[in-house]
């Protein structure tokens, strides 16, 4: 049991010094009180100013205590005033029953398999300001179980070099100053899914290149996940994705509103209403929409899912990039599960997943569920200090314990 203590109302810094980080464990009736990140605070006040007695009769001044455990009665001195706030975080997880069919898409690991069969993912994005975004999406894909990830990022500002440095396991393709799409397009035939947008920025050069890449990907029927600034880009030309049922759009609140306005303009709708996710998906020709928020709504206009499982209250930059990487990988798995199957095998798969299930929508829904669970695990261990890297490190456990356990709760391969 432990308490996190915040000391307030500093009078001076005699005891700590002006910038000392004070960490000390105090044992009080089997409760460990952990003092963290205390600056400019006078922790002890002597009842006697005599230097010879400065270490005697010290009184611990507790201005406020926030605890994640219930304090035992009488554990603190009766002379100490404290307020407590109980907070708990259960790490249990139960896969939603309407996702059971998704397990049919998850590839089994076999010794005869070769590299690439569990997913080859492409990520196009990054800029001088946002180097981390494509890295987060790419490394999440690898941690989830994709075999190969290609990152297409600009050389300008050292973006591509920085990503290479962050992970030698990512295959990084530096783009020239014009971000020539001809550097990317030849690789599209060798990947299963292309994620466009993480950290892309809004420069005219980046957008021009992204438009050409989207067109090329659509021409070869390549599944895509569009996130971040790629969503802003298509708001200027919705025909880039309209009617393409192999694209998943993952807007946050602001991006969703922009997409809704663009769709209404395209369809001559002058109302002030924001389109529902289902109506937006239909207006764009049944693309898959993932409306991110406190409750994620996933729909292709025909079938809809909602994900309101508890994640974490902490918000840190990069969570959307993690989600894009997870959805991209799950989408690749669904597509690969359908490839090379005989008509009899496809019929059996259709029976196991259900007649009306959308592979793309299922992948997006499963991605939302998994990322929330990973965030929950990360927050349990790191609390307020949780960063995106902590969530990524929790992805493997979220996958195994959330999705890949047998009836006895044992992890499957």
From Swiss-Prot:
Q: Which family does it belong to?
A: Belongs to the NnrD/CARKD family.
* Gene Ontology molecular-function annotations: ATP binding; ATP-dependent NAD(P)H-hydrate dehydratase activity
Q: Where does the chain bind ATP? A: 292-296, 311-320
State the organism named in the record. Answer: Heterostelium pallidum (strain ATCC 26659 / Pp 5 / PN500) (Cellular slime mold)
Name the UniProt record assigns to this protein: ATP-dependent (S)-NAD(P)H-hydrate dehydratase
EC assignment: the record states 4.2.1.93
Question: Keywords for this entry?
Answer: ATP-binding, Lyase, NAD, NADP, Nucleotide-binding, Phosphoprotein
**One GO process term, biological-process aspect:** metabolite repair
């Amino acid at each position: 049991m432990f308490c996190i203590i915040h000391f307030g109302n500093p009078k001076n810094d005699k005891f700590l010094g002006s910038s000392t980080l004070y960490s000390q464990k105090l044992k009080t009736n089997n409760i460990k009180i952990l003092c963290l990140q205390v600056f400019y605070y006078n922790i002890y006040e002597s009842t006697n100013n005599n230097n010879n007695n400065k270490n005697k009769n010290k009184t611990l001044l507790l201005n406020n205590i926030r605890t994640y455990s219930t304090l035992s009665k009488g554990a603190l001195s009766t002379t100490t005033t404290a307020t407590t706030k109980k907070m708990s975080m259960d790490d249990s997880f139960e896969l939603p029953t309407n996702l059971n069919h998704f397990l049919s898409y998850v590839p089994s690991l076999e010794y005869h398999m070769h590299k690439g069969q569990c997913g080859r993912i492409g990520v196009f994005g990054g800029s001088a300001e946002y180097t981390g975004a494509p890295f987060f999406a790419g490394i999440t894909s690898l941690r989830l179980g994709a075999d190969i990830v290609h990152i297409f990022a600009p050389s300008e500002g050292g973006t591509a070099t920085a990503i290479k440095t962050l992970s030698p396991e990512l295959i990084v393709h530096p783009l020239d100053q014009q971000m020539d799409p001809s550097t990317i397009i030849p690789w599209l035939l060798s990947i299963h899914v292309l994620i466009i947008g993480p950290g892309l920025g809004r420069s005219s050069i980046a957008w021009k290149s992204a438009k050409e890449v989207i067109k090329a990907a659509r021409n070869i029927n390549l599944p895509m996940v569009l996130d971040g600034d790629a969503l802003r880009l298509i708001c200027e030309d919705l025909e880039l994705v309209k009617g393409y049922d192999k694209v998943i759009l993952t807007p946050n609140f602001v991006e969703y509103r922009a997409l809704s306005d663009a769709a209404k303009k395209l369809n001559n709708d002058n109302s002030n209403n924001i389109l529902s996710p289902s109506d937006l998906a239909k207006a764009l020709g049944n693309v898959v929409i993932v409306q991110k928020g406190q409750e994620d709504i996933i729909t292709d206009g025909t079938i809809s899912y909602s994900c309101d499982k508890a994640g974490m209250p902490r918000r840190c930059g990069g969570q959307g990039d993690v989600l894009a990487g997870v959805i991209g990988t799950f989408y690749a798995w669904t597509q690969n599960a359908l490839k090379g199957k005989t008509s009899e095998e496809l019929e059996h798969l259709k029976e196991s997943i259900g007649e009306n299930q959308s592979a793309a929508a299922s992948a997006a829904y499963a991605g939302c569920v998994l990322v929330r669970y990973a965030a929950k695990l990360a927050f349990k261990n790191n609390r307020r200090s949780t960063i995106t890297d902590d969530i990524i490190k929790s992805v493997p456990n979220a996958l195994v314990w959330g999705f890949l356990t047998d009836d006895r709760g044992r992890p499957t391969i």
